[in-house]
Amino acid sequence: ASLRLDRYRAFLVRDLNQTIYHQSYALRFRLRHMPRRGEESVYTGTLSGLALGHGTIRIDMDSVPNEREGVTILLRNPVSPEAWRYSREHSKSLKLESKDLLDPLVDGVNQSPFELLMPFVFWDATYEKSGRVAGRPAHVYRFSCPEWVREAQPSWVRITLALDDTYEAPLRVETFSNRSVSHKIFLLNSLKKIESTWIVKTFDCKNRADSSNTRFEVLSAALQLDLDPILFAPEGLGRELTIPPEAFLSTK
């Protein structure tokens, strides 16, 4: 079981120097926030990286509240998380603190950069059990929260991760406080095969406190791209991510 987790850790931070060509990707996505009561809100954007599953991620939001133009977020190095936020309106890039990873990706939604970067995978881990999660055989690991998380979220005690037995991909992530019931759940809903590659199509991020759900849905995908690595560096966040529309294949 520990070897399985070690393999997944290594996959997230693998060296791309030898395999960077034709590995880049871009996913057009929709964030749909569904509160228990009230109106839904929808945001769109592009998530991209130098290789699927790697721990360097760029997120270009088309529009966000309180900004006339969209913003770009760079996440990297889940072992020691780093993040930057670039405002196209102000042409300025700001390095974020670790605790900022826990803030919503967009005001009012459940999804945060934390769920996308998954730094907890590298925290102290304990194997809990095997069983079925989302209808699939899985292995569940428990992670203790480090000091920077406890300072930002004092109620958080532990996080659990369910890895698929066959594909070694995350099926479910749960965040626990002192209670035995999780207060936040990240759940994989569906996958989609684009040509010969399986990608995530939808996952939910549920908040038990207010019974809301934010659904991340991939609308189209462009794979096997050659993207300039500078796009995934802090100094390159002001550069536009330009990908021909015909490169995107629908997930419908």
Locate each region found by the language model.
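Beta-turn initiation residues at beta-strand->coil junctions
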Residues: 31-33, 61-63, 85-89, 145, ...
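Flexible, processing/modification-adjacent segments and terminal tails
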Residues: 2-11, 20-21, 39, 67, ...
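Extended lipid/amphipathic-ligand handling interfaces
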Residues: 13-14, 45-51, 76, 187-193
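A short, Trp-centered hydrophobic/proline-enriched beta-strand micro-motif
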Residues: 18-36, 57-59
